[in-house]
Amino acid sequence: MKLRGVSLAAGLFLLALSLWGQPAEAAACYGCSPGSKCDCSGIKGEKGERGFPGLEGHPGLPGFPGPEGPPGPRGQKGDDGIPGPPGPKGIRGPPGLPGFPGTPGLPGMPGHDGAPGPQGIPGCNGTKGERGFPGSPGFPGLQGPPGPPGIPGMKGEPGSIIMSSLPGPKGNPGYPGPPGIQGLPGPTGIPGPIGPPGPPGLMGPPGPPGLPGPKGNMGLNFQGPKGEKGEQGLQGPPGPPGQISEQKRPIDVEFQKGDQGLPGDRGPPGPPGIRGPPGPPGGEKGEKGEQGEPGKRGKPGKDGENGQPGIPGLPGDPGYPGEPGRDGEKGQKGDTGPPGPPGLVIPRPGTGITIGEKGNIGLPGLPGEKGERGFPGIQGPPGLPGPPGAAVMGPPGPPGFPGERGQKGDEGPPGISIPGPPGLDGQPGAPGLPGPPGPAGPHIPPSDEICEPGPPGPPGSPGDKGLQGEQGVKGDKGDTCFNCIGTGISGPPGQPGLPGLPGPPGSLGFPGQKGEKGQAGATGPKGLPGIPGAPGAPGFPGSKGEPGDILTFPGMKGDKGELGSPGAPGLPGLPGTPGQDGLPGLPGPKGEPGGITFKGERGPPGNPGLPGLPGNIGPMGPPGFGPPGPVGEKGIQGVAGNPGQPGIPGPKGDPGQTITQPGKPGLPGNPGRDGDVGLPGDPGLPGQPGLPGIPGSKGEPGIPGIGLPGPPGPKGFPGIPGPPGAPGTPGRIGLEGPPGPPGFPGPKGEPGFALPGPPGPPGLPGFKGALGPKGDRGFPGPPGPPGRTGLDGLPGPKGDVGPNGQPGPMGPPGLPGIGVQGPPGPPGIPGPIGQPGLHGIPGEKGDPGPPGLDVPGPPGERGSPGIPGAPGPIGPPGSPGLPGKAGASGFPGTKGEMGMMGPPGPPGPLGIPGRSGVPGLKGDDGLQGQPGLPGPTGEKGSKGEPGLPGPPGPMDPNLLGSKGEKGEPGLPGIPGVSGPKGYQGLPGDPGQPGLSGQPGLPGPPGPKGNPGLPGQPGLIGPPGLKGTIGDMGFPGPQGVEGPPGPSGVPGQPGSPGLPGQKGDKGDPGISSIGLPGLPGPKGEPGLPGYPGNPGIKGSVGDPGLPGLPGTPGAKGQPGLPGFPGTPGPPGPKGISGPPGNPGLPGEPGPVGGGGHPGQPGPPGEKGKPGQDGIPGPAGQKGEPGQPGFGNPGPPGLPGLSGQKGDGGLPGIPGNPGLPGPKGEPGFHGFPGVQGPPGPPGSPGPALEGPKGNPGPQGPPGRPGLPGPEGPPGLPGNGGIKGEKGNPGQPGLPGLPGLKGDQGPPGLQGNPGRPGLNGMKGDPGLPGVPGFPGMKGPSGVPGSAGPEGEPGLIGPPGPPGLPGPSGQSIIIKGDAGPPGIPGQPGLKGLPGPQGPQGLPGPTGPPGDPGRNGLPGFDGAGGRKGDPGLPGQPGTRGLDGPPGPDGLQGPPGPPGTSSVAHGFLITRHSQTTDAPQCPQGTLQVYEGFSLLYVQGNKRAHGQDLGTAGSCLRRFSTMPFMFCNINNVCNFASRNDYSYWLSTPEPMPMSMQPLKGQSIQPFISRCAVCEAPAVVIAVHSQTIQIPHCPQGWDSLWIGYSFMMHTSAGAEGSGQALASPGSCLEEFRSAPFIECHGRGTCNYYANSYSFWLATVDVSDMFSKPQSETLKAGDLRTRISRCQVCMKRT
């Protein structure tokens, strides 16, 4: 608006200058009489040099308001407003073109589990291949015949068990299964017979007695070693006397071998006796006794270690089906086996399926979610007639073909003309017919000195009204009058004129463009009923109707019957309630063709008669033969007329086609009372159709009954015309009138500002140019006049429901419907009308439901548009209908909102040139008008093709011939060869002016003239103002690759930017081990810890020094009674005994201090650029930078000629220079850039001189020398932005400038070389899907079109050839401190691409790139190698305090310490909540959450923290939100993963739902510990010891990491208690989904810390596959320890 105000002010200032300067010019002609010879014009001098800018003038008067400006740029997004009331539903816009293909949608919900594939043939254990993508589980195959024993394959997936009543064939021997759960001891069996004695075993050497071992650790979950020997039992009762060999000699005792006695029961232990003296030495060892009888069955011993697998035994008898075993580890992928034979279907015996009766109809459920779009169903039978639609006229259909000429209608009564309020002044009208010849004016002798014309005279008296002339040719559109001076006061309305004589019939025009939709007219009174027409032929199937309401009555429940044959038609039902007025009836039949009237010869003109009455509408003329004419301008909206009298019904017409236009939905009516329900009658025999009855008077509205809707009633007679309506609203401003006759040239004005002038007149059509580039989308043109009604098109698809129509008149009351009296329901709130749903497939016949309440249900969601059905058959074309009478004009509609800019449509075909109209008579010249104010800048005119110059016309010096009739455009000639330019001719003498002839009477239309020669090219219009920024266009096609631009001078360094956001998580780096850092400095000694509880006994240490003599041991078991020996003398001292037992382990040394911090490692590689983000709003234009300090580079090569710039603002006018002598013609110079248009020249003589012959061509001139540089002018206002020039040639490289501010992101370059795999990035925000451009078809190459706008900057060219290698090797210096930010340098030209230098040192990480658009989902990557163990994470924040736990047992008295607590979480991996360890307090208990996965990204919980123990379980515990303040829950393909229990999966392997999930979810407890808790891992199968001063809380297995869907997952910090699970399972977690199901899947993996032998630490790990039963032999053990307080 500011710009418009400036241009207005400048225009008014110019006007003031021109008015003020007129007396000076008039003085040059002072005293000239009309007959004298004054030379007032002077000799026109050469065009002077542009003067210096003049002083700024005074501000002008305020200008008139300018035309409405173009739409401004989109403003910034405002704050959210208060939600307004719901507005009325807008008018449905026309359907848009099909959009571009959208970006691929987000992944859908996972499909149902596929059927398992057949079991493959076990292959050999191959070498471990690359990890493949996880396959889907196959179906279990049938048991095949036993093959020859192959090499044992890897363990397969557990197969399904098919229960069969018959015993199967004998199976192959299985591998040893894992040990089962220990059963209850069975009853004692009958002792079996004594077996034969086995062969004697080899005698083993007796082993030395071992030392007593230390007490072992807590046992493992699997079979441990045999326990220690128990304590001495009580003394048993005395046994039966044994057979003792006689004593032969007192000393030389010899025992004879006795028989084996029966084992006695164990007696109670006797009291310990007093230690006796040492007994005499016993006798010699007797012989080994014979094998005793087997004793009773002992107690079950502890489980031994797993033995080695034995040799496969012979096949045993088939066993009973075992319990399902635990899931084994997933084996390696075997080779693909050959396809197996087709399996047999083994039905399960004894399970017949009986189909029960159909249940009662249920209560209506809640509206379901919107389903997926289904496939189109098969074509159903035609539905019942739908209820009558609202009587609202739909939008006009497409123009049909012209119908045959109809009969002339009867003359209607004259309408009542209600004058409206006076409209605004219209544009100047077309010139009227010439009046009678006026008196001759004064004769002006021919002379070369013509004075300026005098002031305009008074208006003349109006002439007599002439005859109505033929329709003249439509004139060119006149120039738009911007800033017209003066607003006339509207005059009073004139008297209505007398009717004119009937005009001759016009020729048939072609359909124009569709006009704007008018407002709906006022509803007329109800018409009389019309005579019913004869039934039409059956039409084609209409579009699918709305589903009708189904009212059913309760009956007895029957079985579903077979489909019966069609019954006879029933008796006519009772009359239904009258429907709303129906759509207009079918058109009548084709009438007889009328006679063709020919136009008679034109008679001599008679005297003007009084205007006659308006004639009847003439018969339609014969169709024209020419091609369609151009689109006409939109007509003025007329005032609504009164409805006409009813016409006589036409005779029967051929059946027409019905196009159903959906009307607007009506307002909801008030609910009526329930009617009495009658019993349904039996169907009667079909009766004959009765005659139509006389319409009854309008009754009171009846009570609506419950019943099926009746068929639509017959169309009523047209109604009696209503009273005249109220005066209409004032009409719109009329069309722009044709241009007036040209005035005489005005006096020379002051040099104006070089504002752009209006565009020149259009030239004659040039030769057809080649198809130019596709232009920008223009603003919508004015609507054309309404086209003629076309033939009915084929039925279109059913449209969406339109807006509500006006309520129709109240119909007569209907008869009471039949129905059962329902109970009165509570009044419901009427819901809005829902969208019509698709027809479903007919379901089974349901039981009749109870009658529903008359309450509209809640609106359903709008369904997805269905897939287009198969096209119906094309029906035969209907006969053309009679032309309808002109309807009353509707009220002007409100202008619709400007629609969104549509995508560019395809270029339409070239139209056929129209026939020329009858030439109009030339009008008289008008009086000279005042010069208008300069108009605003027009739109930039398109450059016209130059026409061929015409030859000079014959010249009569006395008479100036009148303008000849415009001939038909000639066919385009073949372009001639370009000849050499002729020499410049001398200017000819001006010719004598001719006398003005009197205008003749209108002649008859002349014959068709010969084609005229092409006219002179029009003047080049000034450039228009820069248009406003349009809406974002769709992506254009790929431009032609532009030439590489010149290199820019490096800018100055900018200020240090703000720290960037956190970069994306990189991909895993190349697995290499970084250099270890230097040891850090020793830390300060810590505070002394709290004394801990006694630790578990340590493992066996190295042999210690000989211990002190031990204390006397416990009494041994009593030996056999010895015989007393003789006491011997004391012997000498014996030799030293063996070393004693190892001593207790020593105290561990103090903890060392922390090391020095290591040096930082080398910087990592630069991460890959992130995905494109959502495009931000357009940034504000930056301020211009300061001039740089760089030295100017050498001058670049001359650039190509730039495109024409826009005209600048005028400078201050300078003093006029003296006219110099005209120089000789120079040599032909290079073409210069076209300058702005010059000021208008002085007026020439008022008479047209003859056109001179073209002069001979002058020799080409030499280029002139460049003039000296002038002084700089005053700074002008900011010019309008010129068009973007073409890129120049590359200049020489400039000096490097300082680094500039960070610019906006550039266009995406060509892809570089593939970088190394970066680390995996965090997920980017999802980008907005772009519109992918569709590649258009290649056009036919045409001849060169006019010069197009410069194209968009092409993508960067390919890299140039490598230049010579550089010389200096850059060595990275130490980074200096950041300097003061310099001024930004001017952007230099880009230099040519230099050679590839040597690789420099790794630079610092770059600025984060903008998020890219989301790419398409790539294929799943291969699983990477496990990364190095990460550093333990920092401890998380303490959670909020939970509710008080149960009262714990009283703790031991603690030492005084500062009160502090640490939260840990213990997971039971069962359905029972775990107990908190001793010394901790329970905070709360919950369910064990392992990790969640959303938007294909996983986020894990540390199982040792409280965050992994959610107090409530849900298969989808989270939801996701976006930037639009919208959150979605359980509506996407997201997952949650929970620790699971040992509960086996059901045999069907179906996903778990509902309450069946609960047994599979592990429970957990959050405990508060008084000190820090850590986990220690042994990396062996031995349980590690807690550090000294720490107490054990629990032991377990070292759980490290887990992955599942999409190879996503998370892991545990090995220092956290969450990395030490108390139970090992190969599948320790279960996957749950947002749809409420959980299941185990084959792509779920758990990762456990493995055992490492000390000797194998730095050698290559050996591949190994462990089967079930051996899994725990390679899994590291761990212990969770708490610091002793």
UniProtKB/Swiss-Prot annotation:
One cellular-component annotation, GO: collagen-containing extracellular matrix
Sample GO molecular function, one term: extracellular matrix structural constituent conferring tensile strength
Resulting phenotype, G1427V: In ATS1; adult type
Effect of G230R: In ATS1; juvenile type
Glycosylation site positions: N125
Effect annotated for changing G383D: In ATS1; juvenile type
Record region (Nonhelical region (NC2)): 27-41
Result, substituting W1538S: In ATS1; adult type
Effect of R1422C: In ATS1; juvenile type
Function: Type IV collagen is the major structural component of glomerular basement membranes (GBM), forming a 'chicken-wire' meshwork together with laminins, proteoglycans and entactin/nidogen.
Covalent link (S-Lysyl-methionine sulfilimine (Met-Lys) (interchain with K-1667)) residue numbers: M1549
Protein name (database record): Collagen alpha-5(IV) chain
Protein family according to the UniProt entry: Belongs to the type IV collagen family.
Effect of G1421W: In ATS1; adult type
Outcome reported for the amino acid change (mutating P739S): In ATS1; juvenile type
Source species: Homo sapiens (Human)
Subcellular location, principal: secreted
SUPFAM superfamilies: C-type lectin-like (SSF56436)
Places the protein is found: Secreted, Extracellular space, Extracellular matrix, Basement membrane
Tissue occurrence: Isoform 2 is found in kidney.
Effect of substituting G609V: In ATS1; juvenile type
Cross-link for S-Lysyl-methionine sulfilimine (Lys-Met) (interchain with M-1549), residue positions: K1667
Effect of substituting G1143S: In ATS1; adult type
Annotated phenotype, changing R1410C: In ATS1; adult and juvenile types
